[in-house]
Design a protein with these regions (language model features):
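Flexible beta->alpha loop and helix N-cap segments adjacent to enzyme active/binding sites
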Residues: 20, 34-53, 58-61, 104-115, ...
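N-terminal cofactor/phosphate-binding cores enriched in small/glycine residues
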Residues: 28-98
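Phosphate- and other anionic-substrate recognition elements at nucleic-acid/protein interfaces
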Residues: 96-100, 127, 131
Length: 636
């Protein structure tokens, strides 16, 4: 794979050629694909124009296929044909990944022969020839596209680091990326200043914090690459009694946070599973079979233990790099940066003055980072810092105007009322205050895994039954899983022990003590899932069993309609907080279109649906349009 720098060294042979090239530069298409969470992003003159994940269009959760639909969308939104795009950049380098596969097999042979044989055919037929594959796929968008030289490849962790730094509100930062694995790197440290990101240090495969966490995700019966957040949500129900066992046997953590994993206990480098029999023996029982076995206190204690190990490593890494480089700002990306509990602990420790986390921290965000790395790092274009950040609230996906929405609603036979802005906000806030569950579909769809008030299901956080009802009757998901609060930015410190912006729901904090209820001695003795039904605060629907909450601060300048809804709800209830969960059911991607939203509305126990200026009441809909929606999607 040709690296970013390789092509531009040739351009720089003649300075005049380089500068003319720079002036003509306008648009870059970034692509991530073929592992999980395929996505496309486009920037024009360095400005982020659009970004979306392929899963939202295909309705396949974590879709890894070539992001045809996402590319079509971002091109249309940028008003560009593919042949008019100046550069196309893939988020990682396939040749280096193949090198890792070969070297890993050689290092562990003959162990791992089975998985090696399984991986080889697809590498030899497709992945090794990624440029050819991409070129053929790209031509499907525009038959006039014929310049293979436009296709380039970034480094996986540079893509992550660039996605974290360039949209951030900082002109200088330490950038920490951590995930499963890119080409070779699993954790990187970069120093970013002005328009440059310089990777200084790396931890290489098979030593990976992301893969360690995924191994425990697998062991507790959840799906790797999608169930890690469930493991994090399960942790507060347990006690970290296995932490010392993990640190003694599985991972050697140094004082500076660097680490090495003991490969005797893992299969991910050589096998078709994450853990092995020796791992099972260490914890005295085999991996949980998700569909056949209940979660027990053991699994909750395991979750608590690996969560605490992860937090300890992240805190040690952050402390050591702050001490070494003395820079006050931290940017985070990579799948591990979606661990909002660990992020909250970093903020709480005040190691850095400010922390900014890329909302699409996983591989989807790599498409954006690859494009930004090319524009700034390689083409040396200047960077203008936005004090709010450049992600535009992460509202970078498709949107539908009222004309388009009404056309779709008429076609499907929906009953609806059209309301003006004021009436729409008032009626929705009133419904929420009366305990109703509302599907909320407004403006551009979010880029990244979190619903942030554009494609959300909303509820009243004061309700003791809201969490249970949303989990079981609307989302069809496990009862232990917590819900997140959206809160007016100006009121956040009144309700939570935090006074920082958290627009992307990537920081966990505790509920303000003034809003908490004390537990009785009897309640304190409860274990595991029995902790769930205790009312702990004035907002029980968003208060986890450890009095924590994953917070989204809502800002008028990024989502005015959602901000106004929260203000109206506060006016009615004296509470500036709403339950906010993604508009989907378990196993389904977040809804993208009005049709997706209506289908989810009719297939669940949602009471109301608000799409644009259209207000829909479940009771007034044709009951023949209902379906058994819980069977539409494979459970994740």
């Amino acid at each position: 794979s040709r690296g970013l720098g390789d092509v531009y060294k040739r351009q720089r042979i003649g300075s005049s050629t380089f500068y003319i090239y720079n002036i003509l530069m306008k648009s870059i298409l970034g692509i991530s694909a073929f592992y999980h969470d395929s996505a496309a992003s486009i920037i024009v003159n360095g400005k982020i124009i659009a970004a979306a994940q392929e899963e939202r269009f295909t309705r396949i959760k974590h879709d890894l296929s070539y992001p045809f639909n996402a590319i079509q969308f971002v091109l249309k939104h940028a008003n560009l044909k593919l042949s008019e795009v100046d550069h196309i950049v893939f988020f990682e380098k396939p040749f280096l990944k193949f090198e890792r596969l070969l070297e890993t097999y050689v290092a562990f042979a003959p162990k791992g022969f089975k998985s090696f044989c399984k991986a080889m055919p697809i590498w030899l037929s497709e992945k090794l020839f990624q440029k050819k594959l991409l070129f053929n796929k790209l031509k499907e968008h525009d038959e006039n596209f014929n310049d293979r030289k436009k296709i380039m490849f970034s480094d996986h962790h540079l893509s992550h680091a660039a996605s974290a730094y360039y949209p951030s509100p900082f002109n200088e930062a330490i950038v920490l990326t951590a995930d499963g694995v890119g080409e070779w790197a699993t954790t990187t440290l970069a120093i970013a200043k002005e328009n440059k990101v310089d990777i200084k240090k790396e931890i290489h495969f098979p030593h990976s914090l992301g893969l360690l966490y995924s191994a425990f995700t697998y062991y507790t019966g959840f799906k790797v690459n999608s169930g890690e957040y469930k493991l994090m949500g399960l942790a507060p129900y347990g006690s970290p009694i296995y932490k010392d066992k993990i640190l003694k046997n599985l991972i050697d953590v140094k004082d500076d946070g660097t680490f090495r994993l003991n490969q005797d206990y893992f299969n991910y480098a050589t096998g078709l599973t994450m853990t092995n029999k020796k791992f099972d023996s260490l914890f005295v029982q085999p991996a949980r079979k998700a569909n056949n076995e209940n979660l027990t206190q053991f699994h909750m204690d395991i979750a608590a233990s690996i969560q605490e190990v992860t937090e300890e490593i992240m805190i040690k890494l952050a402390t050591s790099i702050k001490k070494e480089y003395g820079i006050n700002n931290l940017c985070l990306a990579g799948g591990v940066a979606l661990n909002c509990v660990a992020n909250g602990k970093l903020l709480e420790k005040k190691i850095f003055d400010k922390i900014w986390i890329q909302p699409a921290a996983g591989d989807a965000g790599g498409s954006l980072g690859a494009a930004l790395a090319l524009w700034h790092n390689e083409l040396d274009n200047p960077r203008k810092v936005n004090s709010n950040d450049d992600m535009q609230g992460s509202y970078l996906g498709p949107e539908f105007d009222n004309t388009e929405i009404e056309k779709i609603l008429k076609e499907i036979g929906a009953e609806y009322e059209i309301k003006d802005e004021k009436d729409l906000i008032s009626k929705t806030a009133e419904d929420l205050s009366n305990g109703m569950a509302v599907g909320w579909f407004q403006g551009r769809m979010e880029f990244g895994p979190r619903a942030l008030g554009a494609r959300s299901i909303l509820g009243d956080p004061r309700s003791s039954s809201m969490q249970k009802n949303l989990n079981l009757k609307v989302k069809y998901r496990e009862s232990f899983r917590p819900f997140a609060p959206s809160v007016l930015r100006e009121d956040v410190s009144e309700w939570f022990n935090i006074n920082s912006d958290s627009p992307y729901m990537l920081l966990v904090s505790s509920i303000n003590k003034k809003k908490c209820f004390s537990m009785t001695e009897e309640q304190k003795k409860l274990f595991g899932i029995d902790k769930l039904n205790i009312k702990r605060s004035e907002i029980p629907a968003v208060t986890h069993v450890d009095y924590s909450a994953r917070i989204q601060t809502v800002h008028e300048n990024t989502n005015k309609r959602y901000y106004e809804l929260l203000k109206k709800f506060k006016e009615i209830t004296n509470c500036p907080v709403l339950v906010n969960t993604s508009f989907n059911v378990r196993g389904e991607p977040i809804v993208n279109t009005p049709l997706d939203a209506f289908n989810c509305f009719m297939g669940t126990d949602l009471d109301k649906l608000v799409i644009g200026n259209f207000y829909l009441d479940k009771k007034k809909q044709n009951q023949n349009l209902k379906k058994d929606y819980s069977k539409e999607f494979e459970l994740d």
